[in-house]
Each structure stands twice: as structure tokens, then as C-alpha cells.
């Protein structure tokens, strides 16, 4: 059984699910139809149908996948709304995950399909909310090996006209999440991601503005198995030890703006955040969120005066 001798370097290089890609082309047709001819007795105000087809390739026009997507949504007269989306993506290849490896130029991906449901509550000045649920394999935009489930909720609370609080939480997990390690070495994990976004906005007349926002991400990858990609795009199990890991990400900012003169503004900004990766199995949400707060990569206080000519 082999073990990586440079585990920390390997885990710095992997994409953790956030990969910038080049060598990519996309073509598609996006079509929509809106219907508003509902009589007075109907609770519906308007509905909309969207039907999309697309093909994704690399720069050599080798097909990565073809997809179709169908969505149906509507708005009610009480300002509530809903949207249901379904997609199907053909089996194809991922040309980007192996970073131009000569040993494995691409990895084969299976048929993908799934459903998304979005619900929006009635809109009012005091309280607003929305719910979402996703279940499927991949999406119309990318391919995956295993099924994923994501659910989330967002609520906005305005106790006064000049004060607003917003809270969003999203929880997702995925079977057989494929992650690049090095060259043609890849790992398959059980992935879980939890995201919380909290914000507050306050306005004091025309001169004062205070904004506070925090975004926290806890990303965990467990039960790793190592695989080698080959020239045909197949994945073969290999006896290499991979460690589970936990990623914590924080972006926190407090920003105060004061209008000194017309077109002249004073900004006072405090920012803190960063990303920490540990090769462990910590799963407590509070502990994962706290890591970049205790050991931030950025911690700054800025005062700036801006004048617009």
C-alpha cells in the first residue's frame, strides 16, 4: 500500500470543487414562453415555460456532453412563486479535471439527470422567505459520477424601513464526488457542504449606511478511494492512501459609509477571512466555521475618502 509523501502539497493543488477551466466551448438554444392570460378567479398571475438544449465541447470540438433542460414556473397574485426544473445530460467526457494529463486526457462520465424545486413565499415589507430542493446527478452545466442532494432556505426580516436582516443556509451532500489529486491520480469521496450567509443593512437618512455580511462554508470529504485515469477515460482503483479532509472558508466584512459632501464619501471598512484545509474528520459546524476566524489569511481595517468628479 502506497502513501503520498507530500500530502500537504497534494491537497493544496486539488480544486476542492472550485476549478477554473479553459479549452472550453458551449453552444445552445434557450427558449421561453410566458403566459399572463388568467381570469380573475385564478390564483395565478403569470406562468413561464423554458426549454433549453446545449452541447459542451473542448477547443477541439470533442463532445463533453449534450443536455436538455425543461423548467416550469409561475407567480401568484399574492406575490408567491414557484419553479420546477428538470434536466438530462448524455454520457460524455470531462476534459478538464485532469489538467491536460498525458496519461489521462479525459475521464468518462455517466448519464446525468435531476430535478430542482424552488418556492418563494409572498413578498411583503416585513418578512420574505424562499426554499429550494435539488436532487440528481450532475447538472446541465457539469457532469458527476454520483447523486447529490441539496436543500436550502433564505429568510429576510425588516423590522423597520431602514433596517434589514437576511439569513441563508444551504446543506448539500454528494456520493462519489470525483476530485483531482495529481496528474492522472484522482480521489472519490463522500462530499458534504454547508453554507451560511448572514447580512445586515442599515440606512440612517441619506448620509449614513452600515452593511455587515458574513459568508461561511464548511466543506468535508470523507471515505476517500484512489483511482488512476487512463488513455480511454476509465478509472482504475489503485492502492494509494488518501486522507479525508475538511475545508473552512470565511468572508466577513463590516462597511460604514458616510456622505461628507455631495459626491464625497467616507468609507470605514473592516474585513476578515480566509480558507483553511485540514486533513481530519472534524464535522462540527461551529468548529469548522471558527477555524478561519481564529487563523485568518486576511484581517484588515481601511479608511478611505472617495470623491466623484
Question: What is the meaning of each model-derived region?
Answer:
Residues 5, 31, 47-51, 82-86, ...:
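Membrane-embedded beta-strand positions of outer-membrane beta-barrel proteins
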Residues 252-270, 291-309:
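Outer-membrane beta-barrel "beta-signal"
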Residues 15-19, 56-57, 100-105, 136-142, ...:
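Extracellular loop and loop/strand-boundary signature of outer-membrane beta-barrel proteins
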Residues 25-31, 66-70, 113-117, 129, ...:
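Hydrophobic, lipid-facing positions within transmembrane beta-strands of outer-membrane proteins
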Residues 33-35, 55, 72-78, 120-121, ...:
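Residue-level signature of outer-membrane beta-barrel architecture
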Residues 8-9, 33-37, 51-59, 86-92, ...:
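Transmembrane beta-strands of outer-membrane beta-barrel pores
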Residues 36-48, 75-84, 124-128, 162:
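Short loop/turn motifs that connect adjacent beta-strands in outer-membrane beta-barrel proteins
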Residues 1-11:
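Single conserved hydrophobic/aromatic residue that forms the stacking wall/gate
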